[in-house]
Regions:
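Thiamine diphosphate
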Residues: 1-171, 307-308, ...
């Protein structure tokens, strides 16, 4: 299989879906002539024209609302946010309109929109540009959330998200855009709500999503090489729907769990997973569930200090050693 970047995988997914379905359009700030802030839409405007790739004003409330309205009429918009931090400007549109319309209309109206963009720290852009709001979005029934960790997952999940008849929020990571993985040339889809074991193990389960999966994999290699501990790494891929069956299966296999999460710890994704394990697999645990999250503070702007705030392989290793 060819090696392609996370960025190219997303680009290919968008192009393939534009070709497959005449109702798929891309909208957002600088997605057309400029090729997107992170070049995810590079070349698409040149290939498909300004009726399929549309630049919008700098008003997230405005263009997200436009996309939601269009989706209610049968269009399948893919909306790019420069940062998921800016979703709060469009919060009413996302939560009250996209998230509630199927329920409020008694199932008569659906909203097949995709909202995508980066949601991560680690790039020294400050507290207002470094939010990871997957927990907030997932708290709303009617909205779906996916956080791809690899190019393979990014392409498969994006194509599935575009074909979904409900709103799907795809949270990417700027630090992954340039990383490469093997991606098959033939078409494939990855169903939402299906986790993936990235590394088989027997001693402890490292459960993560997004770039934290890469952190967990690095930690697993250290645990094996330096401590003789065989860690299993479970990539959630999807936050809502959440693959609770896969979470419980790996915990029942290893009897120990470390949850790795760039989300903040208070009411974060890892808190939800910990509750799931507590409620359904408590008797299987040989030790308390451990968490490695971002420090509970606004994102640090300093390039020297921000890495301290985020999950690291060393922090994951320390938590694993505490319970193994």
């Amino acid at each position: 299989m060819p090696l392609i970047t996370y960025r190219k995988a997303l680009n290919d997914a968008l192009a393939e879906e534009i070709i497959r379905d005449e109702n798929v359009v891309i909208m957002g700030e600088e997605v057309a002539q400029y090729n997107g802030a992170y070049k995810v839409t590079e070349g698409l405007w040149q290939r498909f024209g300004d009726k399929r790739v549309v630049d919008t004003p700098i008003s997230e409330a405005g263009f997200i609302g436009m996309g939601i309205g269009a989706s209610m009429l049968g269009i399948r918009p893919v909306m790019e946010l420069m940062f998921w931090s800016f979703a709060y400007v469009a919060w009413d549109q996302i939560i009250n309109n996209a998230g509630q319309v199927r329920y409020m209309s008694g199932g008569l109206i659906n909203c097949p929109i995709v909202i995508r963009g980066p949601a991560n720290g680690g790039t020294n852009v400050g507290a207002t540009h470094s939010h990871t709001p997957e927990n907030f979005i997932a708290n709303t029934p009617g909205l779906k959330v996916v956080c791809p960790a690899t190019a393979y997952d990014a392409k498969g999940l994006m194509k599935t998200a575009i074909r979904d008849n409900d709103p799907v929020c795809v949270m990417e990571n700027t630090l992954l855009y340039g990383e490469s993985w093997e991606v098959p040339e033939e078409e494939y889809l990855i169903p939402l709500g299906v986790a993936d074991i990235k590394r088989e193990g027997s001693d402890v389960s490292l459960i993560a999503h997004g770039r934290a999966v890469i952190t967990a994999l690095k930690a697993a290699e250290i645990l094996a090489a330096e401590h003789g501990i065989n860690a299993e790494v479970l990539d959630l891929r999807s936050i809502r729907p959440l693959d609770e069956e896969a979470i419980l299966k790996t915990v029942c296999k290893t009897h120990r769990a470390v949850l790795v999460d760039e989300n903040k710890p208070f009411c974060g994704v890892s808190a939800q997973i910990a509750a799931t394990i507590q409620e359904h697999a408590f008797d299987e645990l040989d030790a308390p569930v451990q968490r490695v999250c971002s420090l509970d503070a606004p994102a640090i702007y300093s390039p020297a200090l921000e890495p301290i705030q985020l999950p690291t392989p060393e922090r994951v290793v320390a938590k694993a050693l505490h319970i193994c």
